[in-house]
């Protein structure tokens, strides 16, 4: 079956007018939604679609710009504390209520406002972004609100998008009468054959393939304390390097910093892509503790680098890493896995590395993700002109 992108231009369905909301903007400089919005929107624009990505501004009137063929439309984000994100999302939804064939909202915090485009006949998709309400950073009222918005999203949206099949299955099970849900994964950039420059390792006093690394935000659901405990039980000589902004401003971060030593090293956030690729690529193994959410970008990037992955045992991580990772549920299990990594590293590293890269190249390339989105968008907006969906399309 041919992809939409492979159809002769003269025979392709007419281009779509697509709005992407819910990110801080592009080019990406913050997190997963921003990277997703950039990678998807640029590729859709290259295929002839008129794509608009909404971006936040601290000013009331900022003219639109164009970034690699994508219109960037700015809306003010007020300084209202936690409510500022909601106000920004609502402003974007109000502006996008007409003039588009499809509005794609990243996140469901403003799900109730998705009715504004819908009442004017515009389909609205909502990316459900994992179990956002379960994240420890939210207080009780915020969690209750987000749980309510998850429910609202199931009938405010025309379609729900999940970046993990486990999330899509949960939506169908918990909200059987809600909007249809589709699984389209997050993407990653496969590593080139060129070996990254290892000179940056000296910045952190590291030697290639003689350290273990974690890249994560310091939040309880990412299991950093359990990873540190398991590492200490392991008792090996390779240091544990934790990449993330652990500044000690929260009680959890203060607990983490109590374990700082020559063996447990907190190097702060690394935002330069080349430096981050370096510290990942030359790690003996990558420890992944994330447990809330769907397809995790950090896990995909580690696999794209060819890391030997040891991941927290949950459906989301198993769905992504499959047989290219080892899994742990307790600190003692992690210690056992790390003993195996050290003992078998020279024997199995090349094979494990290639398996991880193969999974990314087969299932998680941005071009493949864009193919899936484009086919589903045409099925939604131009059903009479759309090519057939893949057999597993929903």
Role assignments for model-derived ranges:
Residues 285, 304, 308-311:
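Short hydrophobic beta-strand element within catalytic cores of glycosyltransferases
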Residues 97, 143-160:
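Membrane-proximal helix-turn-helix segments that form the acceptor-binding/catalytic region
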Residues 19-21, 202-235, 241:
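Conserved donor-binding/catalytic core segment of Leloir-type glycosyltransferases
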Residues 290-291:
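Aromatic "clamp/platform" in nucleotide-sugar-dependent glycosyltransferases that forms part
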Residues 85-98, 102-129, 133, 294:
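An aromatic- and histidine-rich active-site surface loop
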Residues 154-181, 188-190:
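A short, active-site helix/loop in glycosyltransferases that binds the activated sugar's phosphate group
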Residues 253-274:
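Nucleotide-activated donor-binding/catalytic signature segment of Leloir-type glycosyltransferases, i.e.
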